[in-house]
């Protein structure tokens, strides 16, 4: 089942895969990593001017990693803005997805957090470095195959 945006993308020859609708009726699309930056720019020009959220998750142990973008088309005088969910999947080994920081500045910290927790490298992100874990931390804590270290540092509460 295709929504309005998916039909528009097909009409303009833009490669994607419709994943249907979520429980709120929001259209969900899958975009290939190599197509993501150009489609992000097109979506911004089309009117999706607000990146509501970005997150990432590990699809399955040993499987793909996903970066998820919730975009909103905010227009003056519209009570119910149009929304879309974009999923970009990346291989577990050397996962790379183009950053959309230069399209939506609000992608800055969420992409850094996704990098820090899952190891997804966002190409052309200006400050991609660990944001929650220490720089010396080894591994990606939110991956399903992550093995927690056998040590815990007890710090003085004062």
Curated annotation (Swiss-Prot):
NCBIfam families per UniProt: PRK12494.1 (NF009141)
Species: Cucumis sativus
Family the entry assigns: Belongs to the complex I 30 kDa subunit family.
GO CC terms of this entry: chloroplast thylakoid membrane
Protein name: NAD(P)H-quinone oxidoreductase subunit J, chloroplastic
GN (gene name): ndhJ
Lineage: Eukaryota, Viridiplantae, Streptophyta, Embryophyta, Tracheophyta
EC number: 7.1.1.-
Role according to the record: NDH shuttles electrons from NAD(P)H:plastoquinone, via FMN and iron-sulfur (Fe-S) centers, to quinones in the photosynthetic chain and possibly in a chloroplast respiratory chain. The immediate electron acceptor for the enzyme in this species is believed to be plastoquinone. Couples the redox reaction to proton translocation, and thus conserves the redox energy in a proton gradient.
GO molecular function (one): NADH dehydrogenase (ubiquinone) activity
Places the protein is found: Plastid, Chloroplast thylakoid membrane
Subunit structure: NDH is composed of at least 16 different subunits, 5 of which are encoded in the nucleus.
UniProt xrefs under Pfam families: Complex1_30kDa (PF00329)
Membrane disposition: Peripheral membrane protein
HAMAP family: NDH1_NuoC
GO biological process, one term: photosynthesis, light reaction
Protein's UniProt keywords contain Plastid: yes
Keywords: Chloroplast, Membrane, NAD, NADP, Plastid, Plastoquinone, Quinone, Thylakoid, Translocase, Transport
Reaction catalysed by this enzyme: a plastoquinone + NADH + (n+1) H(+)(in) = a plastoquinol + NAD(+) + n H(+)(out); a plastoquinone + NADPH + (n+1) H(+)(in) = a plastoquinol + NADP(+) + n H(+)(out)
PROSITE patterns xref list: COMPLEX1_30K
Chief localisation class: plastid
């Amino acid at each position: 089942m295709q929504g309005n945006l998916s039909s528009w993308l097909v009409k303009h020859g833009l490669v994607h895969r419709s994943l249907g609708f979520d429980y709120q009726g929001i259209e969900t699309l899958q975009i290939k990593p190599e197509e993501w930056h150009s489609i992000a720019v097109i979506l911004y020009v089309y009117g999706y001017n607000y990146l509501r959220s970005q997150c990432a998750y590990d699809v399955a142990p040993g499987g793909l990693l996903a970066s998820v973008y919730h975009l909103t088309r905010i227009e003056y005088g519209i009570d119910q803005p149009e929304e879309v969910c974009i999923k970009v999947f990346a291989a577990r080994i050397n996962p790379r997805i183009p950053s959309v920081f230069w399209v939506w500045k609000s992608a800055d910290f969420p992409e850094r957090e996704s990098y820090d927790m899952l190891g997804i490298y966002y190409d052309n992100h200006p400050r991609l470095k660990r944001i929650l874990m220490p720089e010396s931390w080894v591994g990606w804590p939110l991956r399903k195959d992550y093995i927690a270290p056998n040590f815990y540092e007890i710090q003085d509460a004062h």
